[in-house]
Amino acid sequence: MRKMSFASKSLVLLLSIFAARGADKNAPFKPGPTESYPCRQTQEKVTVAVQPFDTEEKTRLAFDKLDPNRYGVLPVLVIIRNDGPSTLMLDGLRVEYLTESRQKVEAIPSREVAKVNAPGRPHISGGPLPTQIPRSSTKKNPLTNWTIEGRAFAAKALPSGESASGFFYFEARHRSGAALYLTGLREAPSRRELFYFEIPLDAALDGR
């Protein structure tokens, strides 16, 4: 019998969460623990796990019928677990998507995601975006869906022993060889900045 890869097991876990939510459409999206994701890294007792939501099957878990990828927006789930002794300050957290060619794509503030679908806005992508991206007025723009801002990463501080999670959004198409780059995590008492996190995302592709 062929064994399932860790990434495949993670996708099954995500799908089981979605199935459990099926009976209650208003139930909040709840990601799994950091150790359930294959793309993760631990430094100084802080673990960061990430999961690109690059398929319709995955986006349905958090955004229901909306697939932001259809409109040129890649959602990436970020979970941060603080097992250190001090509270972490996240107000200066910076998250960038590194393409396979090492091009840095900055995260789009959640309140500005809808502008990606506005006519005339230049694209900054990690590879060709899907052709014939739907264009619509702001009023009917599907990216104005409440889930975009409602699911966004919003934590500004993270006490010891706790986790925080949410989505960051990038104008990019997910491809093999990409990574997520995080900087700006600081210890609250000293304001000392932790070492950066660079997390390869290829393990997530194995779970498709």
Segments predicted by a language model, with ranges:
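Conserved functional micro-motifs across diverse proteins
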Residues: 22-208
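Bacterial N-terminal signal peptides that target proteins for export
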Residues: 1-11
